[in-house]
């Protein structure tokens, strides 16, 4: 095992795929009760170098909530997951085992930051799943004290200000109905990689690998940028020693 360089500010890049994705009355997706069945993460630095990675399938949802799995937005990928588990490309584990693995890697690398693309969704998803599976006995999934970054905020600060990105979106039809450039990881990666044929996998670890490239690209521009979704919280509440407690500090923002 390579020796850990404690001069590096390691980052935990995270991505989730979820079930229980319900359609609202107007056809929009209701993401308020999503449940994580796929969680991938990688330990990276600001250059996008990967030091460790893992791909987990949450047994508690994937196996024990088979009916809910049919509501997954990418339920057509279920056979692929089964094959990946069989050939060792993904590890089946309980949600508590996945959480333990994250706690261990955060401690191992002294990680202070967790990052995702549209991280509000992923942070909410892991917490909703934690509450669902423990009947709210345990409410927060991530280790307490992490700062939460969002590559979507980074891209809006850096990539969206590039004239060439606007031209790229106009040329390829990557504009919203409000004539704004799209900010999906897939479109952003197509732009920074020069591969306009790229198709996002929509599986946890594979998506982490493109999102860390968005992060690295933004840092390479050496521009001022917004990146923090949730800053590191206030000192840990004595009565809640092992949770990521947003409510205790969001009111101070």
Can you say where each PLM-predicted feature lies in the sequence?
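Conserved non-catalytic scaffold segment of RNase H-like nuclease domains
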Residues: 2-123, 127
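Acidic two-metal-ion nuclease catalytic site recognized across multiple nuclease folds
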Residues: 2-3, 170-180, 191-192, 198, ...
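A short, structured active-site edge motif that brings together acidic residues
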Residues: 56-59, 141-159
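Ser/Thr-centric signal marking residues that sit
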Residues: 16-19, 151, 211
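Active-site-proximal helix-loop-helix substrate-binding element of RNase H-like nuclease domains
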Residues: 63-86, 151-206
């Amino acid at each position: 095992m390579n020796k850990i360089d404690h001069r590096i500010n390691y980052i935990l890049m995270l991505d989730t795929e979820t079930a229980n994705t319900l359609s609202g009355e107007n056809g929009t997706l209701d993401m308020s009760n999503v449940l994580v069945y796929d969680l991938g993460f990688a330990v990276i630095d600001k250059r996008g170098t990967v030091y460790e990675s893992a791909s987990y399938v949450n047994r508690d949802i994937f196996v024990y909530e088979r009916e809910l799995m049919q509501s997954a937005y990418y339920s057509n990928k279920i056979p692929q997951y089964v094959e990946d588990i069989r050939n060792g490309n993904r590890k089946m584990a309980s949600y508590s085992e996945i959480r333990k693995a994250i706690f261990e890697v955060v401690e191992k690398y002294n990680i202070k930051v967790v990052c995702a693309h549209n991280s509000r969704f992923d942070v909410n998803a892991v917490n909703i799943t934690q509450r669902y599976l423990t009947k709210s006995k345990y409410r927060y999934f991530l280790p307490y004290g992490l700062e939460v970054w969002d590559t979507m905020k980074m891209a809006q600060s850096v990539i969206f200000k590039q004239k060439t990105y606007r031209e790229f979106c106009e040329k390829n039809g990557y504009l919203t109905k409000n004539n704004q450039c799209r900010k999906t990881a897939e479109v952003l990666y197509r732009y920074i990689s020069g591969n306009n044929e790229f198709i996002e996998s929509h599986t946890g670890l594979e998506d982490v690998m493109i999102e860390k490239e968005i992060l690295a690209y933004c840092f390479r521009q050496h521009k001022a940028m917004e990146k923090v979704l949730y800053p590191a919280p206030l000192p840990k509440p004595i009565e809640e020693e092992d949770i990521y407690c947003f409510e205790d500090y969001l009111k101070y923002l």
